[in-house]
Amino acid sequence: SCSCSETVMQVQAAAASGSVRSCPIPANALLEQYRQDGSYADCYCTDVIGDVSHERYVEAFYTTSVFKLERLILRFAVSRPSTDAQAAQLAQGTADSFAAWSVEARSDNQLLLCDLHGRTRSWLMTAPLENGAGTRLYFGSAVVPTRDKKSGETRLGPAFSGLLGFHRLYSKILLSAARSRLQSQLADH
């Protein structure tokens, strides 16, 4: 057991370093069902000094310059344009779709999105850190396997397997960009 001041110092050190790390999917996570059913599922987290609402996190995540590039690609690749205002509506809970995703489930501190083909899930969650030292931001993904019509076996497919390294790096970049944006916003207030 560590003291409150040690916990605060640990959060400050992690937030200052901008560390994004792989972490277990929390037991209460909306994404957990996919890990349990054999889908590929991952989870990354980072800590932010200060109180960050789930709404603020979702909006920051989908409006970073990194994610805006993905939105631009989706606009042309699958004819699914999106705006910062739509990201804000998604964050506020007044929209059930955004770019190439639709809301599969949401709670006070979580959002689970499904892509337009039903193969991938994106998940965001916030959780307060012990002693009010800050907020933990989570980002995870799931890829639902397809069933081979001949063998009946499930598999993720060669395209996903080939892109897994990129996916892991990109996930860390996205979460780091959201964390940086939120830290900047918190510093301005």
Model region roles, listed by residue range:
Residues 153-189:
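A conserved amphipathic terminal alpha-helix motif
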Residues 4, 8-84:
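Hydrophobic ligand-binding cavity/cleft-lining segments
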Residues 93-133:
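Hydrophobic-ligand binding "helix-grip"
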Residues 39-45, 110, 134-138:
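Intrinsic-disorder/low-complexity, polar/charged segments enriched in Ser/Thr/Lys/Arg/Asp/Glu/Gln
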Residues 49-51, 116, 142:
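Acidic/polar N-terminal loop/beta-strand segments that form early-domain functional surfaces
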Residues 118-165:
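Beta-strand/loop substructures that line and gate deep hydrophobic ligand-binding cavities in soluble
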Residues 84-94:
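Short aromatic-glycine motifs in intrinsically disordered, low-complexity regions
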